[in-house]
Regions:
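Class I SAM-dependent transferase core
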Residues: 2-54, 58, 62-70, 83-100, ...
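Conserved nucleotide-cofactor-binding alpha/beta core module
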Residues: 46-166
Length: 190
């Protein structure tokens, strides 16, 4: 994380707060995760330089850059075109050759590029999407995802062994909702 300048991923009016350990607002109701949470989620993936990682929720691109420092290839899905474009521009300026960004429904993953060694979801889901589980590498693929209701979730790590999926709760957390076919229907609570 020390290699990635968090301030360049923030709106200019938030740059002074870049190294505060807190989530900060971006645009369109989205946030950049607090550094502590970025560290916990990244560590839970147990990344290696040869790994192929799928990130759901590009957002500002900060977490994407952290993943790219540790993994061989990073594929990142963002549902909001404006965020994807801004993140792509920032990451290009920082010269990351191993990042691929696409706009789409993150709850469905990126099946054309599967399988992945690790999948990181940066939005809270009502359950673990089956599409994402299916895209994990069969021999130890890891998925880290916030699961719960719209107000509080548990950060869950799922590990795949063949057709079996073990899971463990890591800690309580709160994320913006994962919207999509296998996520929430609307950004607001019912």
């Amino acid at each position: 994380m020390g290699e990635v300048p968090r301030e360049v991923f923030l709106p200019p009016e938030r740059e002074r707060q870049a190294y505060n350990d807190q989530a900060l607002p971006l645009t369109q109701g989205q946030t950049i995760s607090q550094p502590f949470m970025v560290a916990i989620m990244t560590e839970a993936l147990a990344l290696e330089p040869s790994h192929r990682v799928l990130e759901i929720g590009t957002g500002s691109g900060y977490q994407t850059a952290v993943l790219a420092e540790l993994a061989g290839q990073v594929y990142s899905l963002e549902r909001i075109q404006a965020l994807a474009s801004r993140a792509e521009m920032t990451l290009r300026e920082l010269a990351y050759p191993n990042i691929h960004i696409q706009v789409g429904d993150g709850s469905l993953g990126w099946p054309e590029e599967a399988p992945f060694d690790s999948i990181l979801v940066t939005a809270g889901a009502p359950h673990v999407p089956e599409s994402l589980k299916a895209q994990l590498r069969e021999d130890g693929g890891r998925l880290v995802i916030p699961v719960g209701d719209r107000w509080v979730q548990d950060l869950v790590r799922v590990v795949r062994r063949g057709n079996e999926f073990g899971s463990e709760n890591l800690l309580a957390c709160r994320f913006v909702p994962l919207l999509g076919e296998e996520g929430w229907d609307t950004p607001e609570a019912p």
